[in-house]
Each structure stands twice: as C-alpha cells, then as structure tokens.
A protein has these predicted regions:
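Polyanion-engaging groove/track-forming segments
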Residues: 1-768
Length: 768
C-alpha cells in the first residue's frame, strides 16, 4: 500500500521515520546488521538523516540513501534478474561516449536525417571537440526524455515520428534507434517491464520502502511507486507546508485574470489566499496535486502538523507568526502592536557582496552573544552561488593577515558545495598542465606551479628556496617560450629568436654557476652571477620541473586510446605531485582519471581521443560540487542554494537575493524538444525550483531568518531592486502586518558603504 506521511516540520517526519524503522526491525525480528534503504533527493538530506538517526537512537549504520532514479533501477534489477546489468549503460556518463561514437560513425553520418547534426559539428574549427559537446547535450536531453517523455522514446523505438520539430526530431530519433539496437534496456523500458513482473517478484521487493522529503517526482516515477505499492508498503514522507488543501491556489498573475471576470465572493476568497503559498509553492503544489490524483487520502491528514505555539516557540515572534500563517493556508492580517519587536526576521540592503558578508558576520556575533541557545552548527548561510561569496567568506571569517586578539569573538565556518576545480589549486594546475601543448610557457604560469604545495613537496622546495627561484627568474629575464622553435610555433613565424625564452634564461643561470664575475662572458649570453655553493641544488630542482613540463608537453600531443591517456595522466600525477599532506586531493584527481577510463571502456568506445576531449571531460568532472564535503561539520555552514535540501536550522541566512540573480535563470538547451513542445504535468522548472526553495527556507528557519541583497549601487549609489521572490515576500509582510507606516521599511536595514562608517558606532543608531 502507498502511505503518504505529511507534515510541515522536518523534525516530525524524521521522528516518524525512525519509529517506523524501529517497529519494522522489532516486528520482523531483523538483525542490526540488516541493511535499510531510505530514498532521498540530495546528499545533504542523507547527511542530516544519518546525524538525526544517530542522535535519537545512538547508532546509524548500514543505511543506504539512494536517489530516486537509482532506487527505481535497483528495484528493476530485483524484478527482472541478473540480465539487467549492475550499472545502466544509459547513465549519462556512459551515454555520452555511446552517442559520441554514433555521431562519429559512417552508419549515422551517411543517413539523410543526420545532415543537420553533421553540419553542426563538422563545420567548426575543432570538429571532434564540437562533436563531443553535442554528444553531451544529447545525453542530457535523453536523460530528461526517459524521465519526463518516455512515451516519445517508445514511439521513436517503433519507428514513429511525433512531428515535434523538423530540424531536431529526425536526427535525435535516429540516434535513439541506433542506441537501442544494441541494448534495449533503457530506463523507460525497464520501468515498464518491471511493473509487469512485480506480481511474480513480491518476495524480492523491499518491504517497506521509505521515500523521505522528496519534493518533486515525475509522473512516470509516481506511477512506478504506485504500482510497486500494490505489492509492498511504500511510505512517502512529504514536507507539506500547509495543513489545509492548497492544491487549487494560483499565482498573483492568474488571480488577476480571474478577478476581471469573477463575482465579488470569489474576489474575497482570492484576497484571503496565502500569497507565499500561491506565488512560491508551484513545485510543491504540483507534487501535492499528483498525489491527490492517485487518490491517497493520507495527504490531507493533519495529525503531524504543528503550529509554533505548540512547538515550544514564541508564537508572537514575527517569524513564527509568518510560519503559522503559511501552515493555515490563509492570510490573516495582524496588528503590529500585538507582536513584540524582535530580530527573528531581518532584511539587509547592502552595497556589495563583501559588505553582505561583513554585516552577516557582525549580526551572527550579536545573536550568539544575546542568545546562548544558538550554537554555530545551528546556523546555515546560503547563496545562489557559494563560489561567488567564498573569497569574501574567507577574508571576513578567516582573516589570515589579522592575528586574533585574546578574548575576541571568533566564528568558525565551513564552505560546502564547492567544486574541486574552484577550491583545490592542485586540480587547477593539473588541468592547466593539460594545456601544455598550447601553452606559451609564461614565467608567471610556472611560478604559479611552484606555489602549489604538492609540487613544492615533490621538489622538496622550501619557502626560502621558492623566493630564491623567483628572484633568479627575474634576474635571468625569462618571459615566455621554451625556445626559438616554440616561439615560432606560437607566433606562426620563422624569425623569432630565443631571447627571453626558458632555454636562453636557464643557460644564463647555468653559466653563472660556472663563471666568476671576473671571467669573460660568451658572445651570445649575458650570464647571471646569482648562484653559488649549495644554491646550485635549488637551481637543479627548478631545472627538473621545467624538463618534466617539456617532456609532458610533447607526450600530450596527438590522439590516443583511452588506456594510453589514463597511463600518461597517472604518470604526470606521480612525477609532479607528492601526496604527503595532500593525499585526499591527489586521490580525487586519480579517481577522476581512473573513472574516465572505466566510463569510456564500459561504453565500448575504442576509438582515439584528442587531448581537448580528455581535458573537457575532466573539467566537467571537477566542476561538479561536492555535496557532502563541509556540510554540517559542527560550524557555521555556508552553501549554495540547493533544491531539495530542506534541512531545518535554528538560523537560516540567505545572501545575494538580487534582481536577475535569484531565481536563477538557465538557458534552455537549444536542441531540447521538451522546451519547444507544450508543457506537461510534472515538468521540471529551474525557476519554480528556486521559488519553492525560498519558501522551504522560510519554513526551515526555527528561530531566525536573515535575508540580504545588494540594494545600492557601489558605483553611483542608485537604488537596486531585490530579487522578485524577496519583493513578493516584502509585499506579503506589508499585507500581513498592519502598521501606521509601511511595515517593510521598519524591517529592511540599509547598511552603509564602508564597515567603518560612523553610523555603525553610534549607540543611538539602529545599525549599532
């Protein structure tokens, strides 16, 4: 049976989940080492559940947290048997290489349907790289088709066309048919086959199956779980913001259209609807309605809904009044004199990202000083893109240049959701080295390499020796280019000389070791008298690095098989990096290289690959944020605004709520047929995901909600508009709280341009 367990509190859902698991173990006499499975939608939720289960039961072990698609595939394997491979060949990382092989094949390019696809990549300057990029785009959209348009794929497989686009559909259908000729076990096929075989595999099915805090499911996924529920118990723990029925709420835009034609009674009902649920809750409302459509009455069960006053909170705080309003689903205007002034809701208008972080830092210190119940690990700070704020967080929260005074307050923090490419200098250097065949060998770039700790360890180079090397390179007047031939190749000429090149400069340094100041100088070299005694060993270390880079520059040229690339890249890692104190970073790079080799081999691609394709593949891999690293580490957590991570915190802060920045705008894939066809129920929308994320943040804040945006231009002091979601929230506040003046003006604090402004030190100022 399918059970929906709704609540407006994540903590209550967690308690019920733990109780269900404990009851299941007791009723079925399961052993403590028996595995449990909880389907989640993000790695952050996995970490939160592990921590909560351990906190409430004393132990969290042997629990698997698959994502929705992975769990569906696992159940398909249980039902259909070992004929289904352990890893789906239709996973994106494998699908890319299969599609790349098809695009490169004569069997595809000679077909008339392939004309437009061929023209797209064959007319480019680097056709093989463009072909690979097209393969990545096609893999992305096929993955979406299998979830949201599986009926299209079934029609294509049967040879039918849908008339979606004369320019796009023919060659996409051809690629899909060529993919399924060799292996028909794509996700859509497996789901349909597994549903038919469920009745004969009841004993193999997970019993029960828990799905926790997933706020979006495609119609095909809901259909699969509802069919599965006919043979086993499926529990969906649904974070439902409202205890009442809210599936018929509409946004302000739709409501305005209705008001033009409806009666006064309907207009009054529209006025009472909750604007935040109506405008921000589109994604959650879509799942709510899909669950209603399949007739699961548990969705409206309000036993697990709890108002702030019943949760041990002060129901008269501004934040809890707002949350109670959302839970009721109605807009209930409140006189501001009924609420004591508090700091539970704060909105700050700043000049720049660095001022946002500085103001946040001061406010966190203030709250931690006045509210001892709040601990740093109970504070979450989110940004649309944490990478844009990471440098400012490091400078404000971790000022390495400023010694900490004894007794002064200090906030420890961690920055989550950072990609290795942005956070690890060794990763950036490794990818830089993959550009050696096209590199100018700039002296500044080589000095950057020397500053990488793993390279210094490999060369046994001390900080003093590094400074010495920089001085020598400056004195030797080395600028760029390996030698004259290399400079000619870069400049596409035949008249370059070797002056200012590496060979020219290093020979000047070497000759300086052999000659005294009084000795005669060779005709073509003005040698540098800078090195003597044991310092020659330091020069040798520099020469070793340059020689290795020259060798790998030559080795990286030309196309190679994936096995040859893996061997070469591992050799580069071994020769240039040392793992002493940086083992995790080195493991990350090594794993990415090995995984790339396995993916290409699993896909069955045996052609030669150019360096540009290898470099782009690894760049894509290193650009993926690490969702678990630095999240919930016992400190103030900074993270990106990640959908489906509705983890509760006592204090939630959101920075960067600027117009045009959030909700985030993502350009649709130009070859995506979903984008050019009529929308269907359950379709994903990045914009709606971000709007619902903002609503979840409001609901997940237990004591304090802190919002910040850049409201003044740092260039000309012009007023800048906040994000549309923040403006809608401000409009709601003005409707919710009745005051003689505009309520929002009393909540929004306009911060000065500089942190040393006198207003910040004036005890009579609100900013003090």
């Amino acid at each position: 049976m399918f059970h929906v367990v709704p609540s407006n509190k994540q903590e209550l859902l967690t308690q019920v989940l733990i109780a269900f698991i404990q009851d299941d173990y007791a009723a079925n006499k399961r052993h403590v080492f028996d595995a449990s499975s909880i389907v989640v939608e993000s790695q952050g939720m996995k970490h939160y559940l592990n921590m909560e289960i351990a906190k409430q039961t004393g132990l969290a072990m042997n629990i698997d947290y698959p994502l929705v698609s992975r769990e569906i595939y696992r159940i398909c394997r249980l039902v259909l048997g070992d004929d289904v491979p352990h890893d789906s060949p239709y996973k994106r990382e494998y699908l890319v290489w299969n599609i790349y092989g098809i695009l490169q094949s004569d069997a595809f390019s000679e077909q008339p349907q392939a004309t437009l696809a061929n023209a797209y990549w064959q007319s480019q300057n680097d056709p093989n790289l463009q072909c690979f990029r097209l393969a990545k785009q096609v893999a992305d959209i096929f993955e979406q088709y299998s979830i949201y348009r599986s009926d299209w794929l079934a029609q294509w497989e049967q040879g039918n066309t849908l008339g979606l686009s004369d320019a796009l559909e023919p060659w996409q259908q051809l690629i899909w048919r060529m993919l399924t000729q060799d292996n028909k076990q794509h996700p859509a096929y497996l789901r349909a086959a597994a549903i038919e075989g469920l009745a004969n595999a009841t004993e193999l099915l997970p019993n029960p199956l828990y799905i926790f805090a997933v706020n979006t499911l495609s119609p095909t996924q809901i259909t699969f779980f509802s069919e599965l529920a006919k043979h086993t118990d499926v529990y969906l723990f649904f974070l439902n913001p409202c205890s009442e029925y809210w599936g018929d709420l509409v946004s302000d835009k739709v409501a305005l259209k209705r008001q033009l034609a409806n009666s006064i009674e309907i207009l009054q009902a529209e006025e009472q609807r909750h604007p935040l649920l109506a405008n921000l809750g589109s994604q959650g409302r879509a799942l709510f309605n899909q669950l209603q459509d399949i007739h699961y009455p548990d969705i409206t069960d309000n036993q697990l809904f709890i108002a702030p006053e019943l949760d041990g909170h002060n129901a008269t705080s501004i934040l809890h009044t707002i949350q109670a309003d959302i839970a009721s689903g109605m807009l209930n205007p409140t006189a501001i004199n009924a609420i004591e002034p508090d700091r539970s809701l704060q909105i700050h208008s700043c000049y720049s990202p660095v001022r946002e972080v500085q103001v946040l830092h001061d406010e966190l210190l203030r709250i931690l000083q006045h509210d001892p119940s709040i601990q740093p690990h109970e504070i979450l700070v989110m940004c649309p893109s944490v990478e844009e704020y990471a440098p400012f967080v490091n400078s404000v929260f971790r000022p390495v240049h400023k010694p900490q005074a004894p007794g002064s307050p200090q906030l420890v923090c961690s920055i989550a959701d950072r990609a290795p490419l942005d956070s690890e200098s060794a990763v950036m250097m490794f990818l830089d080295m993959l550009e050696l065949p096209d590199s100018r060998f700039s002296v500044l770039k080589i000095i950057d390499y020397l500053h990488i700790p793993m390279v210094q360890t490999k060369l046994t180079l001390t900080p003093d020796e590094l400074s010495m090397c920089q001085l020598w390179l400056e004195q030797a007047n080395i600028k760029w280019g390996v030698n004259a031939a290399h400079k000619n190749g870069i400049l596409h000429s035949n008249d370059s000389d070797e002056i200012y090149s590496w060979e020219w400069g290093l020979q000047r340094l070497a000759l300086g070791c052999l000659h005294s100041a009084a000795a005669g100088q060779p005709a073509n070299y003005d040698y540098v008298i800078a090195i003597e005694g044991l310092n020659t060993r330091v020069l040798a270390k520099l020469l070793v690095l340059i020689e290795l880079l020259k060798q790998f520059r030559n080795a990286l040229t030309g196309a190679k098989s994936i096995a040859q690339w893996v061997v070469l890249l591992q050799e580069m890692l071994a020769e240039l990096f040392a793992s002493s104190n940086h083992e995790e970073v080195l493991k990350t790079i090594h794993k990415a290289v090995v995984d790339l080799g396995k993916q290409v081999e699993f896909a069955g691609f045996d052609g030669l690959l150019e360096l540009a394709i290898i470099r782009e593949s690894l760049t894509d891999r290193f650009s993926i944020p690490d969702a678990l690293n630095q999240f919930l580490t016992g400190q103030v957590t900074f993270s990106s605004m990640v959908p489906m991570r509705s983890v509760p915190f006592k204090m939630i802060c959101i920075l960067g709520l600027n117009d045009g920045v959030f909700p985030r705008v993502s350009a649709p894939n130009s070859i995506d047929l979903i984008a050019v066809s009529p929308p269907q129920k359950g379709d994903r929308s990045r914009r709606n995901e971000d709007r619902y994320l903002f609503l979840e943040a409001i609901l997940s804040a237990r004591e304090y909600l802190y919002l910040s945006y850049q409201g003044q231009s740092v260039k000309d002091n012009q007023t800048l508009e906040p994000s549309l979601v923040l403006q809608e929230f401000i409009d709601y506040l003005n409707r919710k709280f009745t005051t003689p003046d505009c309520f929002a003006e009393t909540v929004i604090q306009v911060q000065p341009l500089q942190p040393f402004s006198t207003s910040l030190f004036d005890t009579s100022s609100e900013l003090y």
